């Protein structure tokens, strides 16, 4: 029985320091923040990490720091949605990367800002027992589909639904090819009761939170951390308002043991999204 920890982590793409931070002697630039993710990963030791907003500069800063800490990890280069994996526990068999199109058929508007919305897939074999696993990291369109929201753009909900189905089309082919469980993680920019999440359910996927055997975190895992400042994570919203998701298909019984959001104080100025992970047995 292999035990794996699988994480999704939006690391916040913010390349330069901003006035609010400078005035307080702080630094929110990627140059300052990126190295601080390596100790986080050393502390938690995920076997797989699906990134969002991990741009090229950020990627070049984190992996060397992880190696300095004695961590034997490698990366599937997948744009802002790259995948990191533990080479001590996993062997990479196949990978795939695709950017979502800027436009969506039948819907007016553009739905990919600076080519940051994409998905990356890796197929892995566990080194302990040779079990197979397909893993995908994605970041869906960010603007709101709610007309009263300050960042409203018409058809945004439908765009996210279209994008997640693009990912699942590819992931399903890979899952069937290898006859293995498939896990999709990422920043959906959509809550539990959304078209995007429901689209995964309609295709036979289940949310890790809903099938966790031992523990399921009931917090949303999102807080205020932006160019104009950051705040402590107080009075978290409920799970159903979270936008970072982990969905699974083809898993054996009891596969997901725990679903957790990791919210240490030192992480508050690193990103608006707290890491979420699952502990699985395969």
Language-model-detected regions and their locations in the chain:
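His/acidic metal-ligating clusters that form di-metal
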Residues: 118-138, 149-190, 197
């Amino acid at each position: 029985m292999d035990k794996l920890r699988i994480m999704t982590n939006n690391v916040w793409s913010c390349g330069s320091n901003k006035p609010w931070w400078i005035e307080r002697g702080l630094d929110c630039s990627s140059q300052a923040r990126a190295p601080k993710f390596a100790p986080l990963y050393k502390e938690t030791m995920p076997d797989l990490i699906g990134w969002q907003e991990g741009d090229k500069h950020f990627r070049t800063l984190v992996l060397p720091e992880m190696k300095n800490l004695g961590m034997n990890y490698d990366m599937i280069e997948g744009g802002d949605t790259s995948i990191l994996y533990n080479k001590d526990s996993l062997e990479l068999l196949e990978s795939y990367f695709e950017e979502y199109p800027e436009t969506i058929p039948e819907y007016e508007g553009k739905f990919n800002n600076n080519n940051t919305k994409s998905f990356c897939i890796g197929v892995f074999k566990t080194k302990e027992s040779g079990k197979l696993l397909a893993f995908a990291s994605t970041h869906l369109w960010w603007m709101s589909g709610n007309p009263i929201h300050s960042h409203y753009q018409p058809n945004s909900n439908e765009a996210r639904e279209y994008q997640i189905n693009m990912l699942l089309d590819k992931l399903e082919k890979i899952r069937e090819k290898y006859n293995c469980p498939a896990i999709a993680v990422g920043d959906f920019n959509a809550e539990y009761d959304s078209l995007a999440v429901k689209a995964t359910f309609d295709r036979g996927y289940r949310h890790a939170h809903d099938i966790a055997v031992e523990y399921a975190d009931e917090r949303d895992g999102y807080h205020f951390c932006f160019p104009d400042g950051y705040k402590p994570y107080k009075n978290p919203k409920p799970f159903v308002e979270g936008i970072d998701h982990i969905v699974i298909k083809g898993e054996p019984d009891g596969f997901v043991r725990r679903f957790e959001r990791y919210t240490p104080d030192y992480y508050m100025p690193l990103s608006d999204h707290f890491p979420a992970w699952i502990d699985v047995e395969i």
